[in-house]
Amino acid sequence: MLDVRIDDGLRYMDWIELQLAETHRLETEADWAGKVSLNRELYRAVAAAGNLLFAGAFVDGELVGYCSAFLSRHPHYDCLMCQHDALFLLPEYRVGMAGLRLVQTIEREAARRGAAYVAWHAKPGSSFEGILARRCRREDVVYLRQLTKG
């Protein structure tokens, strides 16, 4: 049975980097991204400030998916915002509402901590984009121009 819960994401950095992030990269960034190398210094600093959100999806205690996000004061307005960082679930666990449970867990935790909203991003045409289109308001469109080879 899949257990989705808020947890300490720093505990899982090695597992994510060695077991999950490369699968994630190959699925979503294979054409341009270089080798997976989590910026641990950044994650530790964000966590130390109390601004790292991490939801894990676990099967028999093993992490099979995750969603991470950052809390910060909006740079232009007087509110706390939450920015989605990463969302990944191993393909064999993408059944039913598993991915949505990760999203909802982050949203609940962000609201509990006082965030006014969560800004989500998704690859165009992905199933995640479809989920977001049904439950969120489209606000900005992000374009990526590659400047170096991955």
Q: Could you tell me what each predicted segment is?
A:
Residues 118-129:
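Conserved beta-strand-loop-alpha-helix junction that forms the acyl-donor binding cleft
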Residues 73-84:
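A conserved beta-turn-beta hairpin within the catalytic core of GNAT-like acetyltransferases
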